[in-house]
Amino acid sequence: MKTVIFLALLGLAAAEFIEIGYKVCKSDGTVSQVKADGCELTVKDGKKVCLFKKGSRPIIQIAFKPSKDTDKLKTSVRAKVGGSAMVDFPQTNSDACTYGVKCPVSAGENQIFEQSISITENHPAGEVIQVNWQLTRPDSGKEVCIIFLAEIKE
């Protein structure tokens, strides 16, 4: 088990994060930076778009300051594909405290959330999608809500 954890940490240490374009949606906390590893940044129609390769596991990193003390935060990811309704992106674990957030969370304390996502062969390629990433408190308050554009390539 220790070997698996060490290899996972080694993989994160070798990551090459780049700043991506994002917008903050309604949230209580303050987002200071959003980065990604495994993202090829391009510009389409004047907007920054992260290109993710099928079969890859890009990592998203969000630096933020929470507005309230809380015991835990939950992560959720949704995507808007082809102008349709938002679709939940499946996750095996939604506990943000397992992705670098120091819990219990203290208001005003800098935090870094870091989670990898799996881009499977089933994801549609060649279309720009809107990704909505949130970290919510048990009272349903949003500490983090960001939107960024992504495209999956073969």
Swiss-Prot record:
Domain of life: Eukaryota
Database matches in SUPFAM superfamilies: E set domains (SSF81296)
UniProt-recorded name of the protein: Putative protein heh-1
Gene it is expressed from: heh-1
Family from the record: Belongs to the NPC2 family.
Taxonomic classification: Eukaryota, Metazoa, Ecdysozoa, Nematoda, Chromadorea
InterPro entries: Ig_E-set (IPR014756), ML_dom (IPR003172), ML_Npc2-like (IPR033916), NPC2-like (IPR039670)
GO biological process: intracellular cholesterol transport; sterol transport
Keyword annotations from UniProtKB, A to Z: Disulfide bond, Secreted, Signal
GO cellular component, one term: extracellular region
Stored Gene3D superfamilies: 2.60.40.770
